[in-house]
From Swiss-Prot:
Homotetramer. GO terms for biological process: inositol catabolic process. Transmembrane segments: none annotated. The keyword NAD applies. Disulfide bonds: none annotated. It comes from Pseudomonas syringae pv. tomato (strain ATCC BAA-871 / DC3000). This is Inositol 2-dehydrogenase. Involved in the oxidation of myo-inositol (MI) to 2-keto-myo-inositol (2KMI or 2-inosose). Belongs to the Gfo/Idh/MocA family. It catalyses: myo-inositol + NAD(+) = scyllo-inosose + NADH + H(+). GO terms for molecular function: inositol 2-dehydrogenase (NAD+) activity; nucleotide binding. The gene is iolG. It comes from the Bacteria. Coiled coil: none annotated.
């Protein structure tokens, strides 16, 4: 029997998730949608031909008797409110990042979920579902390269919009690395420093770009992440793990290698959605299957909280240039 989903937010990512849950994935049916722009929500329902009911707001959708699970894809500052409402209603909820816009908000969600007595929350960090990252983690976990000593990473975007600010390099961009590298190493961060190289002439006047984020983990692994959101040439994600006895690199996306006019070339993707489209499918299928089986295994509210704590420290490090401690409480047994 199909899991009946309600989707809050019909912007770009909400529409993508409605489409994949209705047309691509198995075992789900979108029966309810809402958006701050109700006309847009109605248009999405009509254009996709899904026959879902449009609700006045997120709380009405969560309370609807036929909604069995909720997808929160709305504006970031609204996430905490809707996730807490879903937990209070006892309904599983998939929340796009951020889980909340503050670490304190994430902690409220963690506390509410623990009080509920069962896992209800999955956070929309899709990189742990990417085939390349999974292969890289398999190599690390197997011990083939020994203990990881250093990671060299990069997160590059061709360009960003006028509303993009320097701190968004952490809260919107690096946040994915903060999640996936912690998962990759099965280790928590203990400190961070951010430095700014020479500013790119392609960067917006009001922001600093690129920047280098240097993290240390509890087991002593050192990580450097280059964040360069105006690189021009493409969307490029890199991750190299230097171990005691070998090096492992994140594989490039599968592309045709072209030999032509005395040149050997490979295309580079320009859109992040193309780079991780398969991972989005896998993560939502995992949520659907987990809810139906009674156990959610995807990125947890605690993972969302850990990323938020690290992000807060990174933003502080942006501003003061110092090595900033990252202090995370002990993981509750609930999330073991």
């Amino acid at each position: 029997m199909a899991l009946k989903l309600g989707v809050i937010g019909t912007g770009a990512i909400g529409q993508d998730h409605i489409r994949r849950c209705s047309k691509t994935l198995v075992g789900s049916q979108v029966v309810a949608v809402t958006d701050i722009n109700l006309e847009q929500a109605a248009n999405v329902v009509r254009d996709l031909g899904i026959g879902a009911e449009v609700y006045a707001d997120g709380h009405a959708l969560i309370a609807a008797p036929d909604v069995e699970a909720v997808l929160v894809c709305s504006w970031g500052p609204s996430h905490e409110e809707y996730v807490l409402a879903a937990i209070a209603a006892g309904k599983p909820v998939f929340c796009e990042k951020p889980l909340a816009v503050t670490a304190e908000g994430c902690r409220h969600i963690v506390e509410a979920e623990i009080a509920s007595g069962r896992r209800l929350v999955q956070v929309g960090f899709m990189r742990p579902y990417d085939q390349g990252y999974r292969a890289l983690k398999s190599v690390i976990d197997s011990g083939q390269i020994g203990e990881p000593l250093m990671l060299h990473c990069a997160h590059r975007n061709p360009r960003v919009g006028e509303n993009y600010k320097t701190d968004m390099a952490i809260t919107d961009t690096l946040i994915h690395e903060l999640n996936v590298l912690r998962w990759l190493l099965n280790d928590d961060y203990v400190s961070v420093q951010v430095v700014f190289p020479r500013k790119s002439g392609k960067a917006l006047a009001h922001m600093k770009d690129p920047q280098i984020v240097m993290l240390e983990t509890a087991r002593g692994t050192r990580i450097d992440v280059e964040v360069f959101v105006n690189c021009q040439y493409g969307y490029d994600i890199q991750c190299e793990v230097v171990g005691e006895s070998g090096i492992a690199r994140l594989p490039e996306p599968s592309q045709v290698q072209l030999r032509r006019e005395a040149k050997l070339s490979n295309a580079i993707l320009m859109d992040w959605k193309d780079r991780f489209i398969a991972a989005y499918d896998v993560e939502l299928q995992d949520f659907i299957d987990g809810v139906k089986a009674g156990t959610i295994y995807g990125p947890s509210a605690w993972d969302g909280y850990a990323a938020a704590v690290a992000a807060d420290a990174c933003v502080l490090a942006q501003n003061n240039g110092a090595v900033v401690p990252i202090t995370l409480a002990m993981r509750p047994a609930f999330y073991a």
